[in-house]
Amino acid sequence: MREAVRAGIDVQCLPGATAFVPALVSSGIPCDRFAFEGFLPPKKGRQTKLESLRDEQRTMIFYESPYRLLKTLQQFAEYYGGDRQVSVCREISKVHEESVRGTLDEVITHFTATEPRGEIVIILEGCKK
C-alpha cells in the first residue's frame, strides 16, 4: 500500500464498520501500530491533549469537522513540526471521496486554498525517535 501511494497510484479501500480503517490503510502511513484518538476537545483540554501526544510513536487517528480542520492541522504543525506526514481523508466510500497526503505544511497549504467539506479522518504519523 505504501509503495502504491508513493508511486502516485490512486488507492481506495472498501469501508467497514468504521471510517478510520480504510483511511488508515489508504494513508500510506505505517499502520502496524496506531492509536485512535477520536475528536480532540474543542476548547478545554485541547492543548493538554496535544501536548500529551507529542512523543506518541504510534500512528494517530483523529476525527475532525471541516470547520476545525485547518486549525487542527496548524496546531499539529505547531506541536509536532510541519514535516510530519499526514493524510486527510474525507467522504470515505462516497462519491466525493478524497485523500490528501503529504507533510503537515503541504496539507495545510492545500486546505488553505481548498475549503474542506464532509466527514473527515486525519491520519498523523507518529513521532520518530
Go through each PLM region and give its residues.
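Class I SAM-dependent methyltransferase SAM-binding "motif I" and its flanking Rossmann-like core
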Residues: 1-56
